[in-house]
Amino acid sequence: MKIEQYKGDLNVIKLIQELTVDKYDNIFRAIIVHGSVATNDVIPYSDFDGLLIIKDEFVDSDELRRFKKESMKSILNFDPLQHHGWFQITESQLSDYPESYLPKAVLKNSKILYPFSEEIEIKIDIKHKPNYKYGLFNMINQLENKVLNKWKPKNMFQLKSFLSQIMLVPCLYYSAKNDEGIFKRESFDAVKDVFKQEEWLVIEIASQIRNEWNPQLNSLQRLALYQPNRLFRKAVVKFMPISIPKKHLDLLDDNFYESLVLLIQKIKKEI
């Protein structure tokens, strides 16, 4: 698989590249960015999706831990509400690629951050076909439990995580039904016609909120959320919550949750 060099101008990419070259250039086979950052479709909702391909001897190293901590500062500056860290595999895993962890289809739309070259060739061998149904049912069970427990997001951090789970369902559904991975953005059009309007409504509302995303953080919240310490960030989210705007709350009405239930029921019948 050939992966082309990232040629955008996002500051987060430049900072990670500089950090890698200055201090950590010996521990990686490659650093890859995927998702909206790679395709130059960044909007305020966008988070940072990056894959580290680590040389095997550094997988448990202090160098790798320091890199993650230092690079997360730049990533959290890009998206203070980022709810996941780096994806990572070892160089040896390329010969038995974990397709269920990060589908190969995602990498086809990715870009290389390091090393610096017009493109690199990465040989990926998938020896074990993943059980795509497992990932799908794991996700819809999480969502179903939220509905059954009458859980609702209390702040923007929780809302983003919740919406991201919902918007991953079309991708997981496609993979489970067709036994192959797909780029998340392409999955919406690929499966939309399978569902009735009332079943698909929850996806449309989640997408609308995504497109209107504009969290209002005060200076203290922003400064606190730049910190990569997970426990500290949890405390910030709990004790200095970022309020959900009324325009978003109005969309998260009974119709939204009823549609989510209908979507889940439809999928359980289909798969």
Kindly label every feature range from the protein language model.
Residues M1-I32:
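Helical scaffold of the NTase/Pol beta-like nucleotidyltransferase catalytic core
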Residues M1-L10, R185, D189-Q197, L201-V202, ...:
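N-terminal regions immediately upstream of nucleotidyltransferase
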Residues M1-N11, K68-L163, L168-V169, A190-V191, ...:
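Conserved NTP/Mg2+-binding pocket subregion across the NTase superfamily
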Residues L15, F67, S74, A190, ...:
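Charge-rich, solvent-exposed alpha-helical interaction surfaces
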Residues N26, I43-Y45, K160:
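A generic fold-level signal
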Residues I32-K69, H84-Q88:
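Catalytic metal-binding acidic patch
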Residues I166-E180:
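Extended, well-ordered alpha-helical segments in internal regulatory regions
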Residues E212-I271:
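Charge-biased C-terminal accessory regions appended to nucleic-acid-, cytoskeletal NTPase
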